[in-house]
């Protein structure tokens, strides 16, 4: 008779409309993910407050020996991921591995992944526009007497949303390796989710925005629509999607296009890095392949 599918996600680390199951379900409904439109139920995997988790071994884990994953996700017999592939201000791009690793982590699991470093403000670059404070869900950003942003590290969750919100590169990670550490931990969390059961993965490489989908102020797409990719191997899938984006022509009136048009811009010949220069997107793929989750080699079959 087939399986009984359900749609799922875990609560976010930062406050907002997905910080608990009740508001999360309302958010899902407002975005069209509801039984009346999809034909299946929606379950928030880590429960009402994001504490319903399972500690799962990470196969060959180097940075995380165990992962804290939403219980409903680990209770499922089969795992299918559906990902919107886009740019990302901390990880370079948000693909299948990020969707699984960060998306399936409980709130505590997300905190572990983000723990390498909290953002800081280079006040000489701050324009006092207050955009970062509006984006911060933790009320961690205030302004001093000179109207320069100040981050309260006791309130900061380390989610990095303020980095993407700043148009003037005034906010950066305190730890030089923080983004790379985040990438590698995400890969290991994704491996914990997928290990030991059938999995299949689909990526929609469309509306390729420069930053994470959690940004309400996200900018115009940086690249034209490319298509829909699918694979049993999430590592090969992310590599194929990334390669397709690297070979695409940047859209002129986008964050990427405008960066490339700046006089004296230090071009990286990398559409992700030229959109968000302080990222190291290859680390996720390297780590996932290293611990045996999949391979970066692929054969592209067009249909």
Where is each model-derived feature located?
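Extended, low-polarity segments enriched in aliphatic/aromatic residues
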Residues: 1-303
């Amino acid at each position: 008779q087939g399986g009984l599918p359900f749609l799922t996600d875990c609560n976010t680390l930062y406050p907002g409309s997905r910080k608990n199951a009740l508001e999360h379900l309302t958010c899902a409904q407002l975005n069209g993910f509801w039984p009346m439109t999809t034909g299946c139920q929606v379950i928030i995997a880590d429960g009402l407050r994001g504490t319903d988790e399972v500690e799962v071994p990470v196969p060959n884990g180097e940075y995380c020996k165990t992962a804290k994953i939403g219980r409903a996700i680990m209770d499922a017999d089969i795992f299918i991921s559906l990902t919107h592939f886009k740019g990302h201000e901390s990880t370079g791009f948000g693909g299948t591995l990020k969707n699984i690793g960060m998306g399936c982590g409980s709130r505590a699991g997300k905190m572990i992944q983000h723990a390498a470093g909290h953002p800081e403000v280079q006040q000489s670059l701050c324009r006092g526009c207050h955009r970062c404070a509006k984006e911060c869900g933790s009320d961690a950003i205030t302004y001093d007497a000179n109207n320069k942003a100040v981050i309260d590290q006791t309130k900061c969750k380390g989610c990095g949303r303020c980095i993407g919100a700043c148009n003037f590169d005034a906010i950066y990670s305190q730890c030089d390796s923080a983004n790379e550490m985040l990438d590698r931990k995400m890969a290991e969390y994704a491996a914990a989710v997928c290990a030991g059961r059938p999995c299949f993965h689909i990526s929609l490489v469309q509306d390729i925005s420069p930053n994470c989908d959690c940004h309400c102020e996200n900018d115009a797409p940086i690249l034209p629509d490319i298509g829909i990719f699918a694979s049993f191997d999430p590592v090969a899938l992310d590599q194929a999607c990334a390669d397709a984006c690297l070979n695409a022509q940047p859209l002129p009136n986008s964050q990427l296009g405008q960066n490339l048009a700046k006089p004296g811009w230090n071009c990286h010949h990398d559409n992700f890095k030229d959109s968000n220069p302080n990222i190291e997107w290859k680390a996720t793929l390297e780590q996932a392949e290293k611990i045996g989750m999949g391979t970066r080699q692929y054969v592209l079959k067009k249909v």
